[in-house]
Amino acid sequence: MTEIAIPRLKLEHIYKSFPGVQAVSDVSLNVYGHQILALVGENGAGKSTLMNIVNGVVPLDSGKIYLDGQLVSIPSPRRALELGITMIHQELALIPELTVGQNIFLGREPRRWGIGVDWKRLYAQAQRELDRLGIEVSAQATIADLSIAQRQLVEIAKALSYNARLIALDEPTSSLTSRETDTLFRLVRSLREEGVALIYISHRLEEVFELADRIAVMRDGHLVAVGNASEFTPAEVVRLMVGRELAEFFPKVPAKRGEPVLKAVNLKAGREVRGVSLELHRGEIVGLAGLVGSGRTNVARLLFGADRLEGGEIWFEGRQVHLRSPQDAIRLGIGLVPEDRKAQGLFAGQSVRYNAGAGLIQRLSRWGFIRFQAVNRIVRELVERLRVRTPHLNQKVRNLSGGNQQKVIIARWLGLNPRVLILDEPTRGVDVGAKAEIHALMSELAAQGMAILMISSELPEILGVSDRILVMREGRIVAELSREEATQDRIMQAATGQL
Amino acid sequence: MLNGNHSSSFISFLRRTSTYLILLVILVWFALLSPEFLTVGNLLTIALQTSLVALVAIGMTLTIITGGIDLSVGSVAALSGALAAGLATRGGLGTYPGLLIGLLTGLGMGFLNGAMIVWGRIPPFVATLASMAIARGLTLVYTQGRPIAGLDKTFTFWGGQGALGIPVPVWVLIVVAFLAYFLLKHTPLGLHIYAVGGGEETTRLAGVNVGLVKFSVYLISGLCAALSGLILTARLWSAQPNIGVGLELDAIAAAVLGGTSLAGGVGGIPGTLAGAFIIGVLSNGLNLLEMPSYNQQVVKGMVFILAVMLDYFIKQRQAKPKGNPAD
Amino acid sequence: MKRSIIYLLLAFVLVLAACTPAAQTATQAPQQGGEITLGLVISTLNNPFFVTLRDGAQKAADAAGVKLIVVDAQDDSAKMTAGIEDLINKKVSALLINPTDSDAVVPAIQKANEAGIPVFTVDRGSNGGTVVSHIASDNVAGGKMAAEFLCKAIGGKGNVVELQGIAGTSAARDRGQGFNEYMSASCKDAKIVAQQTADFNRDKGLKVFENILQAQPEIAGVFAHNDEMILGAIQAAEAAGRTGIVFVGFDAIDDAVQAVKDGKLAATVAQQPALMGQMAVETAVKYLKGEKVDASIPVPLNLVTKDTVK
């Protein structure tokens, strides 16, 4: 970085507005080869729009884009690919029904006799690409059969097969285990060695500081800071992102631990859950840590009646209960905020009112008719209490940011006054400000006497929010740590079996 | 799960072959119960009768793989048959120009469907429901509701006996099925058809002209429907304005029985052919077994549900180890 | 999960097994040489007329000790052809065909001819192929029957109107022929003052008869080639306040039978589908036993009047 290089990508005074929003405002930014630039900002800060402009997904209003010193226009994703610009999206852009090779070469299949696809060549080339990157996946495997991490790596292989000179990665680790994250990081670093320019978008500041050479911070469409990573501290970055000082990352109101509400004894289900016992008390937040795949989500689903129990007992307020379906759990007052909010938690095409009120409808119906006024009143209260940022209750939920979507799901449960709330990765893909709000809300609920079980892959979150931490490994609970004795190291040791 | 590998490979075998196994079971069953069933003559009859549905089902399969559907096929078949027969006879154009116009009619209706879906952004179900009514209406307007007879031998040839004692419609089916198979499995368009059904936006971002892919499948579906209508007209020696009512349902059933997912992205020609033959064999076999027609409909419906459920359960079981996404 | 697959397979087998009882008789029948199996391919069983026809055929088959296989074409010419092909492969002794369409059925009949299976058409005829006999209602006799009744009802004299069906159809031709033959031969004092077509259609019947009412101040009786037209005519007469007209229809549809009960319609000529089915079976059996049968078997009709209606 001592030599003065021509930037791989040079953005000059980029502007872009959507109806009612100035999404990107006067952004000038250089991205160099042999470097990883971390682009951070809260959701809605304009990172995605900026990346979409660079990838030709949306046209810019004004400004100039230079690639290796050449002025270029990028009217389509196709053109971006031709220029060697690729983007790895948060929602993976792979077609699950097709094979790895077919996905990599989609739209530019090698031909035979002019009309046919040369499958042999396609698979050979794809396999060569995968092998080169050290990705242990068969080019003939179907995407649907791969893990999320493998798909992510395939996506990168696909990007590189375009001879990418600039790769943007949008939240690539949000669904990876730490081991998979390591693999990804290795790959990203080796790409840097090869001279690729990388833009890395993430909410996880630890990752940003681990990986990035430079950091660029966006807020409200503006680029508010850019510089070498060593010039920043995490606290500074957060302050720049939210534009205010966050007093406490994870505000935790100490709560009095009450009597036990939910007790699980030796739960068993398949290979994923092999004898889990736990107890939740009123007023406490229990963190459930462990690697992805350790069975955390399965335990949550068993406690919610979503999966069938093969062995063990569940006790609720001193009575043994048989949860045959989520309805049973809901009737008792157990709620689950699922990990995959788009697929399991939200009716994305419906309004905030509908999503927040969906759980109330049954209770607030009389003679088969929904009492809309009552539903409206409660929904409005909840939306205000949870500070859901939405222009109005009829806004489609898919247009809200991740954090606000999560709040809507929590609002739905609060309308039912649950005694136990299980949250599975409640802040995944949620920006820093909203994250703190969700944490504050959890501790407030606990203080009011609710028992909360939170699953999280983010250790700082687990450590900051939980009163008590359970660590799972291979279907069993292998450690129970109090707030005081828990550290990142102890949790990781338990989770990886190095105890 | 000590026998995990063993049982899962058995299940994956079942998954790949369930449609064919069901067809085989039905064939064996009828062969055991009816002495007339397993004769060359009867098997050829089944092939002949099935070819009409199978042709339409091939086009339907392509549309369904892209995540769409074509409800207009039955009406398009009737319209193509009527126009071809009418122009060949009363129009005085002769057989081949008539047949050509019949095929062009199918392409034209396919174009209309494609235009509504790609340019008009109308959901395929709605768009083709509309063209289904339009094509049927045009057929009735053109024929005034009456059959058109008086086709000459060059026309009726297409519904009759062909080389090697195999009926011409069966030959046509073989050729079309082969072409469609090649298209799906060995051409970029085929790959793109699967891709559009698996993820339209992803496909678009990969630089594929998604609109063109969709247009292609509706054009092909229209062409297949027209072929089926022309062959049916040749087989009946007359164009009947009310042929093909409900044909779309048989075609969808054949595709679904053959493992094509209505959600798109999955399916194939061999499966669809097997599905069409399940339907054809059932009709023929139940007639041979002298089952009263009312009961036949019940049995067909039940076999359909059972076959689809069996397929679903086998696939679900196969998918199970990966079913629970993250944890 | 494995268990549910087994249950499904079991259900699958059970459904197939449901076909067996019929099959057992099926496998025996053709093997006992000399047994007669008739195949009846019927245009539709969604119409009570044809259901009754089938019931009549079944009764006659039972009485004659022959087997009858019925295939429903569901008003679909392709299904009809397929059904005929299936029964040819089944090697039935004779085929009774009630075509969906007189042209579309021809190739299938030719296939039966090639297979040496005698073909009989019922109700609707075929425009080609070799057919042993055509069994259908005797529309000429029906027209005569209507004329005879009408003549008597108006006392043998007065002005008479004939509402005709679609020109060129066999029903319109035959019904009109029988009616006019009787009127000119045996009811000479009555005068046919108007003969107009109303296309078998109730609406047209109403409009056409309105005009006739304008032109003809004196009308004693009306005969229409079907009930739809006569019901239209009755409406027109009621609207115009004309009374004392004797109305006679054809087909005995439900509305018309009700009108007979109400006394608005004097009579309607009824086809006898059960008898048609019965005669079809009897004709085929006779032929298969080596007797000679006529090429055209007229099925008698039946007059529905206030006295005969149930």
Report residues per predicted region.
Chain B
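Transmembrane helix-bundle core of multi-pass membrane transporters
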Residues: 124-187, 213-216, 235-244, 295, ...
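Helix-loop-helix "hairpin" substructures at the membrane interface of multi-pass membrane proteins
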Residues: 93-102, 107-113, 117, 164-239
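Hydrophobic core segments of alpha-helical transmembrane domains in multi-pass membrane transport
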Residues: 19-32, 59-60, 136-137, 172-183, ...
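Short loop segments and helix-boundary regions at transmembrane helix junctions
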Residues: 7-11, 69, 88-90, 94, ...
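Single transmembrane alpha-helix segments in multi-pass membrane proteins
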Residues: 28-91, 116-121, 255, 259-269, ...
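Hydrophobic alpha-helical transmembrane segments
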Residues: 17-24, 46, 53-54, 75-79, ...
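Cytosolic-side transmembrane-helix boundaries in multi-pass membrane proteins
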Residues: 1-28, 32, 205-212, 286-327
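Transmembrane alpha-helical segments in multi-pass inner-membrane proteins
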Residues: 225, 235-301
